[in-house]
Regions:
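Core catalytic lobe of class I
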Residues: 1-153
C-alpha cells in the first residue's frame, strides 16, 4: 500500500505496483535518457513506465515529462519524441509541448550546429486536465511570446 506524504527511493514500477487504484493527480519528472549517465546497468523501460503511470493516474491527471536528446556525431537521437509516442500509445493525450530553456546548459563548441540549450516538457493528460493555471506574471521574454495565444480545446 502507498503511504501519502512519504518519499519512496525505489524503482517507480515497484511503487506503482503497490496500489490497485488510480491515485495520482500529477507526476513531474526528468527521467534518465539516452544513456547520458551510468546507472549501474539500469535500463529505463519507457513503455512500461508510461503504461504504469496511465493505469495509476486519475482521470484528469497529468504527467509532466522533462526530457532532451543526446547529440552523437552531429545528429540528435530524437528519443524525446520516442518517449512522447510511448505515452500516447499508452493512452495519454499529448496536452501540451513546452520548451524548457536551460539557464546553464552543458558547454559545447562544435562550431557546426546550434547548441542544444533546452529540453522538452511534454504535458500528457488522462482525459481533459482538471486544472489549468495560465501564467499571469509577466516574463522576461514576453515579447517573444506575443504571437502565442491560449485557446480553449
Amino acid at each position: 500500500m502507498i503511504e501519502f506524504g512519504k518519499i519512496y527511493n525505489e524503482n517507480c514500477l515497484e511503487t506503482l505496483g503497490r496500489s490497485s487504484e488510480s491515485f495520482i493527480d500529477m507526476t513531474i519528472t526528468s527521467p534518465p535518457y539516452d544513456d547520458l549517465r551510468d546507472y549501474n546497468g539500469y535500463h529505463f523501460p519507457v513503455e512500461e513506465i508510461a503504461a504504469g503511470l496511465f493505469e495509476k493516474t486519475k482521470e484528469g491527471g497529468v504527467v509532466i515529462w522533462v526530457v532532451g536528446d543526446r547529440t552523437y556525431n552531429g545528429s540528435e537521437s530524437l528519443s524525446s519524441f520516442s518517449h512522447a509516442f510511448a505515452f500516447r500509445d499508452a493512452g495519454f493525450r499529448v496536452h501540451d509541448t513546452m520548451i524548457y530553456a536551460k539557464n546553464n546548459p552543458i558547454p559545447s563548441d562544435c562550431g557546426k550546429r546550434y547548441r542544444q540549450a533546452f529540453e522538452y516538457m511534454f504535458c500528457f493528460s488522462k482525459g481533459q486536465p482538471k486544472t489549468f493555471n495560465p501564467l499571469t506574471i509577466p516574463i522576461k521574454q514576453e515579447k517573444a511570446f506575443k504571437s502565442f495565444r491560449i485557446t480553449k480545446v
